[in-house]
Amino acid sequence: MPGGRDPMPSHTMELPRLIVIGEGNMGDLGPFLGSLGGPRTVSLISGRTVQGATGRKIEGSLKRSGIKWSWHMAGTNDPESIASVQEAVRSDESGMAVGIGGGRAVDTAKMAAFKLGIPFVSVPTAASHDGIASPFVSIKGDKPHSITATAPLGVFVDIGVIRKAPARLLASGCGDLVANMIAVRDWELGRDRKGEYYGRYAASLALMSAKIVMENAARFAREGVDERVVVEALISAGVASCIAGSSRPCSGAEHLFSHALDRIAPGAGLHGEKCGIGSIMMAKLQGQDWKGIAGALKSVGAPTTARQIGLDREDLIEALMTAQGLRPERYTILEEAGMSRRRAAALARVTGVA
């Protein structure tokens, strides 16, 4: 090799082919799916509420496009529920799985499509997390972190639908975006301490997505959170993970903290809320502007304390102490800090989280 360098290992990037963001455009879903290969039959994975709110427009659009469809309800994202939907999609002899809804529907469709080897299309109805455009899914009762499935072939967003979702979901999405600041710094640590692959472009894209929230927080506080800005940032973050070939640019110590809380206090807080709270504490450990992160989260209406999401001080301390052990191969600031009970308690206190 020139300069005596060892050859770099192969790196595969699976990216969305087509992304459409509009407003009042849910009735155009049929032509969108047709442009992705013209499936004759599609499986629509959703929830009852979302089906009731969007079903008529979607079905009319599919009918006009000559596409047959079947609806399947997403469960609780446990392996059994996903397997049940997967078998239903298999029975459809479907050419595409379409996830319509929040995290559960999108993740279920993503995993079913991956297992069956068919294309997956993401149709988010809430901007609560960056999984809408990434290849990763979170499965309850499986691994204590996200696992790789398949990137969406297409992403279709109706901002009008996103706007009708509870404001809490949008604030959660902002928390998931701010977390990228922690994740990228942890990725740099992995590169420097362990010789881990580091993709500068993917890292920059993830950081840009986080900065969108940080730089617009004051405006969002005055005028309300701009749904389109957050949606575009979440999609960019998902694409950053696609480019990296791993969740590294968007998942670091703050996500391990969130996954630890999933085990300690199931059902407490949304994913992005826990990642946002974790980001405040991890930023303090990393020497980043943790006060700025806390201020930005407050500006968008996201929680910044344990009490706001129904957790107590002991929950946080336990999560901080056990988080790194959930994924020991992923080097983060938690491994460097050596999180003892005393240090965890001090961190929660100093940052005002608990």
Swiss-Prot record:
EC category name: oxidoreductase
Subcellular location(s) of the protein: Cytoplasm
UniProt cofactor note: Binds 1 zinc ion per subunit.
One cellular component (GO) term of this entry: cytoplasm
EC number: 1.1.1.261
Binding site for substrate: D130, D176, H259
Protein name: Glycerol-1-phosphate dehydrogenase [NAD(P)+]
Keyword annotations of the record: Cytoplasm, Lipid biosynthesis, Lipid metabolism, Metal-binding, NAD, NADP, Oxidoreductase, Phospholipid biosynthesis, Phospholipid metabolism, Zinc
Biological process per Gene Ontology, one example term: glycerophospholipid metabolic process
Pathway it works in: Membrane lipid metabolism; glycerophospholipid metabolism
Binding locations of Zn(2+): D176, H255, H271
GO terms of molecular function: glycerol-1-phosphate dehydrogenase (NAD+) activity; glycerol-1-phosphate dehydrogenase (NADP+) activity; metal ion binding
Listed cofactors: Zn(2+)
Its job: Catalyzes the NAD(P)H-dependent reduction of dihydroxyacetonephosphate (DHAP or glycerone phosphate) to glycerol 1-phosphate (G1P). The G1P thus generated is used as the glycerophosphate backbone of phospholipids in the cellular membranes of Archaea.
UniProt similarity note: Belongs to the glycerol-1-phosphate dehydrogenase family.
Binding site for NAD(+): G103, R104, A105, V106, D107, T125, A126, A127, S128, S134
Chief site of localization: cytoplasm
Complex formation: Homodimer.
Catalytic activity: sn-glycerol 1-phosphate + NAD(+) = dihydroxyacetone phosphate + NADH + H(+); sn-glycerol 1-phosphate + NADP(+) = dihydroxyacetone phosphate + NADPH + H(+)
Keyword NADP set for record: yes
Stretches of the chain forming a coiled coil according to its record: none
